[in-house]
Amino acid sequence: MKKICLTFVFLLSLFPIYSSQNKQAAGTIESGSSKSSGSSVGNAGPATPEFKSYKEEFSYWYTYYSVYYDVLNALNDDDDNKDKKKNDEDGKTETITSAKKQNGDDVKSDNSKSTAIKKSGGGKTDGEASKKNNSANSWKIILKLLGFNVVDKENGNGKGGSANNGGEGGATSAGSAGATSGAGANGGDAGETEAGEGNGASSDGAGGESGGAGAGAGAGAGAGAGGGAGAGAGAGASAGAGAGGAQGDAEAASAGSTAGSTSSGGAAASGASSGAGSSDSGQGASAGGAAAGASAASAAGGGGAAIGGSASAASGSAASSGSSAGASAAASGSAAGGNKFTKLIKIVQMASMMGGVENLMENPLALQMIMSSSGASAGASAAGSSAAGSSAAGAGGGAGAAGAAGASAXAGAGAGASARAGV
């Protein structure tokens, strides 16, 4: 499936080349030779150079197809493993031949056997095999940086790191020795110097854990944004309950408290309580009812203020977490912006122009320019949506404070009604 997708990408990469040739403006014809002027306008990749001879054109396209073959080879680890085993067998044949020479056996048959085995290995020299492995490893690094899931089947438990480079992560789950690159799919490449510098001396490739930490930071930012939204929803639910309580008290209170109940928050509930207490006429019971109403009003006012303060603090906390989550989302958005297939097309074309992926890896500025394209717009979009979310959470907290104050004053209204019944 990976080969089919990359074949499609390779065919797409040819369109910008032909389109750039078609965009060249035709020039004037002078003395039997045509001259063309103008350059390609598209930004899909570098335009094909003008070839002076068929040999030069053949050399360019041969390099182009070689680069594409290297990309496929980076995703086909079985071939690499077979070549490695064959190279190991070639080394063993020389040892067997020398041992049989010491024992006085037939040298001619040993040489023919050794030659046959070397032919079965493909006849590749050590230089060709190492060049192929270097090219495949370079493409593996590029594909991982672009976000493709490249799993090295040979490294199930991970490789040890050197003094400056972290170990190469395997396909095992998080927590085991091979999970140095964040389980292979989420974290960065463990063999990069930036990820593993100073930590790669251990045998389990500890340097790659920097890549895993990057994935953890992304998950943390998501959890923070969810927490802010949850705080806002909780405050809104409290507001609904408070409003319902105040309305019920208004229906049970006397006519004098109706005006107070139409207000919002703690003031409405305290007015209902004092109205219920003072509406009764009697001897000692009237004074008792008024005192109970005043006491309930003061308790309700204090409770409302305390709840309002708590809600304000919660709103501020939600806004803070929302803004920090927005900053994290903006950073991750700018890093992950752009289409990985588009970038892969540009990298394949650039590697063809430079004569191979090894030359491209030696020029990190060109590679970084392609990697960082189209990232700023994605980051800005993420930051805008996060900011809107934190504002909504703050508004919900304020509404919750007003409603909760009304609910707390329900006890005051009940005390006034009891005093009236006592008369």
From Swiss-Prot:
Highest classification ranks of the organism: Eukaryota, Metazoa, Spiralia, Lophotrochozoa, Mollusca
Name of protein: Glycine-rich protein 1
Signal peptide coordinates: 1-20
Tissue: Nacreous layer of shell (at protein level).
Record's subcellular location: Secreted
Compositionally biased tracts (Gly residues): 159-172, 205-219, 236-247
Organism of provenance: Pinctada maxima
Compositional bias per record (Low complexity), positions renumbered to this chain: 31-42, 173-183, 248-284
Bias (Basic and acidic residues): 81-93, 102-111
